[in-house]
């Protein structure tokens, strides 16, 4: 672990942050689309 050089560690941290941000953004988009679809169906059934 300590033998790892700094460039690898920095790249790993950057990749981890990018993946985390992308996952949160994708989940938010999925949630909004799901919310819109459910609202549309509720409006149709009302």
From Swiss-Prot:
It comes from the Eukaryota. One of its GO terms (cellular component) is mitochondrion. Keywords: Mitochondrion. It is found in: Mitochondrion. This is Putative uncharacterized protein Q0092, mitochondrial. It comes from Saccharomyces cerevisiae (strain ATCC 204508 / S288c).
